[in-house]
A protein has these predicted regions:
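Catalytic domains of cell-wall/extracellular-matrix polysaccharide-remodeling enzymes
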Residues: 3-10, 16, 20-134, 139-151
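Short, basic/aromatic-enriched C-terminal tail that caps enzymatic domains
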Residues: 146-167
């Protein structure tokens, strides 16, 4: 909702684009993809006054049409499969900590009833801070690493300094 976006933005979060309806965009036409992305970017801009700079493809499903149409770098991240309720708190913690790396993007979900991720974060955040990691926005990460926010990169970034499509 617009209120949640404003609240997160005012707390210092980036508000990026993940689509309006979470479709498999590889099965959509260029026009359908553009409409999906523009709708969401327009809503974000209405809510917080800035357009998204990054796009996270639903299901991490991509094709060349998406790269051609979507004028933003694609991001993914390392996660804990926390969309799966069968994955418990400790396993979520272990997965995230095992994949942590300098410049890495952590992907976790805020979904209905997903209290296990909230509980896991209570352990993940202090553990990563103890290891010297800092938590920054995607935009701050790219700037800190000197990585251009290039909409034509055709990379799905899981870490900032990535140079191949998948990292």
């Amino acid at each position: 909702s617009a209120e949640l976006m404003k609240r997160a933005y005012n707390m210092g979060c980036d508000i990026e684009n993940h689509s309006q309806s979470h479709p498999d965009m590889t099965k959509m036409t260029a026009e359908e993809i553009k409409a999906e992305i523009d709708f969401t970017s327009d809503k974000v801009e209405e809510a917080v006054g800035e357009r998204p700079q990054f796009f996270r493809p639903p299901y991490i499903a991509v094709n060349q049409t998406m790269f051609d149409v979507i004028d933003m770098p694609f991001i993914c991240g390392y996660g804990a499969e926390d969309y799966n309720n069968a994955i418990g708190v400790e396993e979520r913690v272990e997965k995230v900590l095992a994949q942590a790396r300098d410049g890495g993007i952590i992907l976790l979900h805020d979904m209905n009833g997903n209290v296990q991720t909230v509980e896991a974060l209570d352990k993940i955040i202090p553990a990563l801070k103890e290891q010297g990691y800092e938590f920054v926005t995607i935009t701050e990460l790219f700037h800190a690493k000197g990585v251009a926010i290039d909409p034509d990169s055709e990379i799905i970034y899981s870490y900032a300094e990535q140079t191949e499509m998948y990292g």
